[in-house]
Swiss-Prot record:
It is a multi-pass membrane protein. It comes from the Eukaryota. Core subunit of respiratory chain NADH dehydrogenase (Complex I) which is composed of 45 different subunits. Interacts with TMEM186. Interacts with TMEM242. This is NADH-ubiquinone oxidoreductase chain 3. PANTHER family: NADH-UBIQUINONE OXIDOREDUCTASE CHAIN 3. The gene is MT-ND3. Keywords: Electron transport, Membrane, Mitochondrion, Mitochondrion inner membrane, NAD, Respiratory chain, Translocase, Transmembrane, Transmembrane helix, Transport, Ubiquinone. It comes from Avahi cleesei (Cleese's woolly lemur). Belongs to the complex I subunit 3 family. It catalyses: a ubiquinone + NADH + 5 H(+)(in) = a ubiquinol + NAD(+) + 4 H(+)(out). The keyword Transmembrane applies.
């Protein structure tokens, strides 16, 4: 009985919401509102636009560092291990690799946005 009452209430509520949606006035449809958004590029324009290689390199660098930072997320759970010295050594090694990668990227002027 309880399940059937719940189902009938859900169906009645859904039908009520559908009827209200049909009675509400339709909003103006703008063509720009319904066109696809492609990261600031015109989707109906030419697909052969020049692409900024600097933007691509910064995006790839962000993805690499983001994935490496995700490797640090299990550290609080890893700190409960019995071999704490090995865990801390591995965490320090990972952070050192991240710092070395950041220093290399900085020295190669990969983080500067100048044309």
């Amino acid at each position: 009985m309880n399940l059937s009452l719940t189902l009938m209430t859900d169906v009645a509520l859904a039908l009520l919401l559908v009827m209200i949606a049909f009675w509400l006035p339709q909003l103006n449809i703008y063509t720009e509102k319904y066109s696809s958004y492609e990261c600031g590029f015109d989707p109906m324009g030419s697909a052969r636009l020049p692409f900024s290689m600097k933007f691509f390199l910064v995006a790839i660098t962000f993805l690499l560092f983001d994935l490496e930072i995700a490797l640090l997320l299990p550290l609080p759970w890893a700190s409960q291990t019995t071999n704490l010295k090995l865990m801390l050594t591995m965490a320090l090694l990972l952070i050192s690799i991240l710092a070395a990668g950041l220093a290399y990227e900085w020295s190669q002027k990969g983080l500067e946005w100048e044309e």
